[in-house]
Amino acid sequence: MGGGWALGDLVPDIQADSTMGHIKVRDYCKDGWTIIFSHPGDYPPVCTTELGKIAAYNPEFEKRGVKLLGLSTDTVEDHQGWIKDIESYTPDAPVLYPILADPDRKITVALNMMDPDEKDANGKPLASRALHIIGPDCRLKLSLLYPGTTGRNFDEVLRVLDSLQLASKHKIATPANWQKGEPVVISPSVSDEKAKQMFPQGWETVNLPKALRMTFVD
């Protein structure tokens, strides 16, 4: 994505007004998982569908103990007016998450969410369709970046979130196209002796030049 914020880095100590009051971003991210997502601007139709879908998926995020935090370079007043459009698109899913206002672009730059190719009417760069997953330690665990022409897939966001949360509890990784409930890969750094203690349910070994051990975890 460019810039200096990378996986494993601490969330910057930044703050801004939002649709739900003033928010200190690092404090907001403490003691749980957080998704920070940006959009190019208020009212564009793709952005409306995205934020509506996020609102509709909120019960799934709540099940996983995840807080949501939106962001664009528009004002709080713009956000509040736009929420009416969003809730018209998904009438059964109210917008229950805050949206940060960042007209001076300070937070967008600090979180590495700027799109240098997209400009507003005054020639200022806009936020990209970026999405960051922040762990309970307030460090960046995953980033997704989409161009303005492509809306995000929130089933994929849930999938990678499930993977991250499992990997935070167990010495495992998830294979290609993995879905929740499917077998996972025991880390190669775990010896068979140690694996017997960590995974008493056992595992299945896939015969490859370097053995692949698959098991199930919750």
From Swiss-Prot:
Keyword Oxidoreductase part of the UniProt annotation: yes
CDD domains the record matches: PRX_1cys (cd03016)
Disulfide-linked positions: none
A single cellular component GO annotation: nucleus
Record-linked Gene3D superfamilies: Antioxidant, Horf6, Chain A, domain2 (3.30.1020.10), Glutaredoxin (3.40.30.10)
Domain Thioredoxin: 5-166
MF (Gene Ontology): thioredoxin-dependent peroxiredoxin activity
Predominant localisation class: nucleus
Record EC number: 1.11.1.24
InterPro entries: AhpC/TSA, Peroxiredoxin_AhpC-typ, Peroxiredoxin_C, PRX_1cys, Thioredoxin-like_sf, Thioredoxin_domain
GO terms for biological process, alphabetical: cell redox homeostasis
Active site: 47
Family annotation (Pfam families): 1-cysPrx_C (PF10417), AhpC-TSA (PF00578)
Matching PANTHER family: MCG48959-RELATED, PEROXIREDOXIN-6
Function per UniProt: Thiol-specific peroxidase that catalyzes the reduction of hydrogen peroxide and organic hydroperoxides to water and alcohols, respectively. Seems to contribute to the inhibition of germination during stress. Associated with the rehydration events involved in the recovery of the desiccation-tolerant moss.
Protein family per UniProt: Belongs to the peroxiredoxin family. Prx6 subfamily.
Name of this protein: Probable 1-Cys peroxiredoxin
